[in-house]
């Protein structure tokens, strides 16, 4: 009985090791570029069925190479693909991973704005969480060029596209000097 149990455990461990070994191929930049190329049709439209596989490859590369100088870039692209697929939970997860793992990368503030706008505001219609993402960008990256976009996004939260256009038009009209018109 003991020998049968040992043999069973050994067999299960061997199968597990073989199964894992097949999925842990070390990905290279070339692998990612090939995956990226497979994402598009000839007319540059997205192959929707390929998108999840490509995003997963990007994540796998980051997991295997967390210190690589391009890891934050690939993680951002994985997040972008998930946003495009309207996979809100995965998009938020990847944004959180990116801002925690690579807070000093150029992609961290972009991820906050992207998820605030496209996930919380557009997909989930959660203006409170969208506001929180914009505010996090403003607070944690005060010198980033995207801060102004985040401030405008907060100003426009909850407005329809028509209301936003009306505000922009009014703002532009207010900037015009009346004396300039009279001349």
What do the PLM-derived regions correspond to, one by one?
Residues 41, 78, 115-116, 154:
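Structural register within alpha-helical repeat arrays
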Residues 16-19:
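C-terminal motif of bacterial Sec signal peptides marking the signal peptidase cleavage site
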Residues 45-57, 84-94, 124-127:
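Helix-turn-helix repeat elements of alpha-solenoid scaffolds
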Residues 61-71, 99-108, 124, 138-152, ...:
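Short solvent-exposed coil/turn linkers within tandem alpha-helical repeat scaffolds
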Residues 31, 58, 75, 112-113, ...:
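TPR repeat positional signature
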Residues 21-24:
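Bacterial signal peptide processing site
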Residues 136-140, 145-183:
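Terminal, low-structured helical/coil segments at or just beyond the last alpha-helical repeat
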Residues 82, 119-120, 158:
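Residue at a conserved register position within TPR or TPR-like alpha-solenoid repeats
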């Amino acid at each position: 009985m003991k020998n049968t149990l040992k043999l069973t455990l050994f067999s299960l461990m061997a199968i597990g090791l073989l199964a894992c070994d097949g999925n842990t191929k070390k990905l290279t930049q070339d692998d990612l570029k090939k995956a990226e190329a497979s994402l598009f049709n000839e007319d540059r439209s997205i192959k929707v069925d390929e998108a999840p596989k490509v995003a997963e490859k990007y994540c796998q590369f980051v997991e295997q190479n967390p210190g690589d100088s391009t890891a934050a870039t690939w993680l951002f692209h994985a997040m972008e693909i998930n946003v495009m697929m309207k996979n809100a939970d995965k998009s938020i997860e990847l944004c959180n991973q990116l801002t925690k793992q690579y807070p000093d990368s150029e992609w961290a503030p972009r991820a906050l704005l992207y998820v605030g706008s496209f996930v919380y505001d557009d997909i989930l219609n959660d203006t409170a969480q969208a506001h929180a993402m914009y505010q996090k960008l403003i607070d944690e990256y005060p010198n980033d060029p995207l801060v102004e976009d985040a401030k405008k996004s907060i100003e426009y939260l909850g407005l329809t596209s028509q209301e936003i256009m009306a505000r922009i038009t009014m703002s532009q009209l207010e900037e015009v000097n009346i004396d300039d018109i009279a001349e």
